[in-house]
């Protein structure tokens, strides 16, 4: 859903993509919070994927933040280690696919979190399209 207008994103907008080799460093990955709930064997990573300026311009986006909460049982991986692993798997999926779009990035995250140590993945996105 477009967070500015409240309208649903169409299939054409979600599948509109650009070749990955046309844009250098198309995605920014950031962990902005790591939680260790008490008395549990889980760790929660709050990961944010931001589209770079050139990718947003090619896809006619004003803002594109994809926020994920990844609930894992992996207590040994720190935030930076998990972020490197997550980034590598997402980029590997997108490199094999060759086209980067909103839906392909979400599919790449599903590929990266389809592991035995991942329990849940919660998504919360902030996407705004350009009007002009």
From Swiss-Prot:
Biological role: Increases viral DNA accumulation. Enhances infectivity and symptom expression.
GO biological process: viral process
Similarity comment: family membership: Belongs to the geminiviridae replication enhancer protein family.
Claim: Cell cycle is one of the keywords in the record: no
Classification via InterPro entries: Gemini_AL3 (IPR000657)
Keywords tagged on the record: Host-virus interaction
Organism: Abutilon mosaic virus (isolate West India) (AbMV)
Top-rank lineage group of the source organism: Viruses
Protein name as annotated: Replication enhancer protein
Matches recorded under Pfam families: Gemini_AL3 (PF01407)
Assembly notes: Homooligomer. Interacts with the replication-associated protein (REP). Interacts with host proliferating cell nuclear antigen (PCNA). Interacts with host retinoblastoma-related protein 1 (RBR1), and may thereby deregulate the host cell cycle. Oligomerization and interaction with PCNA are necessary for optimal replication enhancement.
